[in-house]
Amino acid sequence: MSKRTFQPNNRRRAKTHGFRLRMRTRAGRAIISTRRAKGRTRLAA
């Protein structure tokens, strides 16, 4: 029996999909701006 693939971890979540990480790259900033334009309440993890 294999284990579940999703093992929740808030620190890992923030480090891989967080706002600071998104702002680091040009593509990441594009993601944030798209989500802002769409009117998302949560921009990043």
UniProtKB/Swiss-Prot annotation:
Xref: Gene3D superfamilies: 1.10.287.3980
Gene Ontology MF annotations: structural constituent of ribosome
Keywords of this entry: Ribonucleoprotein, Ribosomal protein
GO process terms (BP): translation
Cellular component GO terms held in the UniProt record: ribonucleoprotein complex; ribosome
The keyword Ribosomal protein belongs to this UniProt entry's keyword annotation: yes
Keyword Ribosomal protein: yes
InterPro entries assigned to the protein according to its UniProt record, in alphabetical order: Ribosomal_bL34, Ribosomal_bL34_CS
NCBIfam families: rpmH_bact (TIGR01030)
Record family assignment: Belongs to the bacterial ribosomal protein bL34 family.
Listed name of the protein: Large ribosomal subunit protein bL34
Species name: Salinispora arenicola (strain CNS-205)
Protein encoded by which gene: rpmH
